[in-house]
Amino acid sequence: MEEALRAWMLNRPDLGKCLIIAGKPEGGVREDGTVTTWYDPTSEELAHALATADTVVCRSGYSTLLDLAVLGRTAVLVPTPGQPEQEDLARHWARAFGFATCSQTELEAGRVPQPAGNPPHVRPNEIAIARLRAWTEIPTLEPAH
């Protein structure tokens, strides 16, 4: 996906500066004209990049979709070839939330749709904290009269 994205970005001068987050543990940064690739960003760098990007093109794995939902971002979803759960998730998010999708083959051919959709509105930390409190509260027992 990285090379296909880089080729697409370099052929689209209208996109301006672009950032690829490859998520590979070897670290480092690669510069190719207007395209920068981060190989091992911190959580803070990743959140800032997603929050401030004009366009997000990403895989449709569970953790990526959770990041998009928490940040309230739309994206073009590109399922990993041969990963049926990512294909199912991309189809579901396209139907349920209007997200744009394309296949790896379409990405490699430079046929990337405009991002679209309305991510689900979630407040996971508030919900999790409320549930945790409810599960861990010890009820006070009133003395029997």
Q: What are these language model-derived features?
A:
Residues 65, 69-120:
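Catalytic binding pocket for nucleotide-activated donors in carbohydrate/polymer assembly enzymes
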